[in-house]
Amino acid sequence: MRLHQSPPRLLVCILSVLQVSAGLSSNCRCMPGDSCWPSLNDWARFNTSIGGRLVDTQPLGQPCHDPFYTASECNELKQQWTHPELHDASSSSIMSAAVANETCDAFTPRSKPCTLGAMVRYAVNASSPDDFVQTIRFSQERNIRLVIRNTGHDYAGKSTGAGALSIWTHSLKEIDFLNYTSAHYTGPAVRMTAGIQGTDINPAAHKKGLVIVGGECATVGPVGGFTQGGGHSALSSRFGLAADQVLEWEVVDGMGRLLTASPTQNPDLYWALSGGGGGTFGVVYAVTVKTFPDFAVTGVVLQFENIDPSSNRFFEAVGHYHRHLPTYTSAGGMAIAQITNSSFLLTPLTLPAYTAAATKKLLGPFLQDLHQLNISYTLNVTESASYFQHYMKLIEPNPTQLVQNAQYGGRLLPLDLIERNNSQLTDAVQKLTADGVTFVGIGLNVSSSVTGDIWNSVLPGWRTAAMTVILTTSWPLGANLTKMKILADKMTTKWVPILTALSPESGCYMSEADPQQPDWKQTFYGRNYDSLYAIKTKYDPLQTFYATTAVGSEDWQVEAGGRLCQATRKN
């Protein structure tokens, strides 16, 4: 499939970009209140040019603050605040408490002024690629920061920015199942536009007797940063990462060109978008990915407690779990284990094409280890006739589906670590959890033995990983911001380095990481970075697209008040 744009529109856009390049000489993007900021009449004319699709940001938490306070609305907001559906239906709301910075929080005092802070100033509720083109052009002509957003599932603040104009893709809801034919793949596929979420595609695929490699969180959008950043799934040990399934992209680049990117058309852009991160190479309108026939699935939930902290039996059991984990992932399983200093919760272990009997046999050696340690546990093994049924039973109800305010860090841990130095991993888990950190280990196998010969820009450390780890510490609603920032700094300087010492070369999944990661280029992109930067320069020569820790972001810096300025070059 190849999309075409009329030559007159394309020519006008390219000429416009060339003409405005001189207008981008300012070292900083324009902000509200600047003399270069568009007037209300300018915004009105732009709104007319895009069919009235401009959204003026009204902060979601506004009803909880004077002079807009409404008790009933505020109470309802507080009840719904941790539900992602509340935020992903907004063009501007920020799920991450660290990024939102209490600028308009439903849980801060009513008397505290409600400001936009890091929220975008305006958004374009896009309905077509032409809306992308028009918005890119306007942002370039007016030297305005531009960001891309679907749902706002974003720990690092990539999809928002103070004084920014957002391309909001949330209304683009098309799903087309097709038989795809190319030199590289022939078989079932699905084309999804940029606003699709798991809540849309999962039931649609199920009705067709198919599955896709999508996220564990149902409200995440598979077309944006999820797949563009790699994207792990409960089906990853069976099929690979989400980025491994991409057949082609439809994308508007920084020159306003609507392009198809596949292994044969603009292959460098295809390679970059498939794992090199979102928000920086262009605005994706649609993606076409592989689909697979559905199958029966068995799910496991296993829990035990640290009832005797004076002994080391609990962490011995954790060590045994990690020792057995490669057996589960080699069988096509994907495991999510949450470990604190008081409890271990596996919820769930997903085993495609396994029966309950086969699953219990697979778990047998680990359960025997627990018996020998005299550790009591609860175990539930659930068979489902389809992956969708399994998802709705064991994954969708999981508390991790809620907005999780926390300090985040992460690391990919290689299989070699478990096989050779599992005791060091156990010591690290014990040290981290003793400090109040939750260790979430997502066990999977996306090596070449699973994916085959894949060509994309996924961080190489994924291919040798036994698990991707997320570290979190609690961020209660209404918590003291200063105290939370202290914990965030500890994540950067103390807790993440514990895992880095275990696997200094592996890197980290960019979408579940410390936003303050010091060596982010190496950690998130590895040896791919220089090639990704060259592709960024080719398709976005004016550096229209910026996102925190995205490729090319080192050329910019966020200054006081959120102003985005060109970074000072070091000699």
Curated annotation (Swiss-Prot):
Entry GO terms, CC: fungal-type vacuole lumen; vacuole
UniProt cross-references to InterPro entries, sorted A to Z: BBE (IPR012951), FAD-bd_PCMH (IPR016166), FAD-bd_PCMH-like_sf (IPR036318), FAD-bd_PCMH_sub2 (IPR016169), FAD-linked_Oxidoreductases_BP (IPR050432), Oxid_FAD_bind_N (IPR006094)
Alphabetized GO MF terms: FAD binding; oxidoreductase activity; polyketide synthase activity
Biotechnology: Patulin was originally used as an antibiotic and specifically trialed to be used against the common cold, but it is no longer used for that purpose since it has been shown to induce immunological, neurological and gastrointestinal effects. Genotoxic effects of patulin with dose-dependent increase in DNA strand breaks in brain, liver and kidneys have been detected in mice. However, more recently, it has been proposed that patulin might also have anti-tumor properties.
Species annotation: Penicillium expansum
Annotated family: Belongs to the oxygen-dependent FAD-linked oxidoreductase family.
Stretch forming the signal peptide: 1-23
Any Gene Ontology biological process: patulin biosynthetic process
EC number: 1.-.-.-
Cofactor: FAD
Effect upon mutating residue 381 to I: In strain: MD-8
Protein name, as recorded: FAD-linked oxidoreductase patO
Pathway: Mycotoxin biosynthesis; patulin biosynthesis
Gene designation per UniProt: patO
S-S bonds: none
Annotated ranges, domain FAD-binding PCMH-type: 115-294
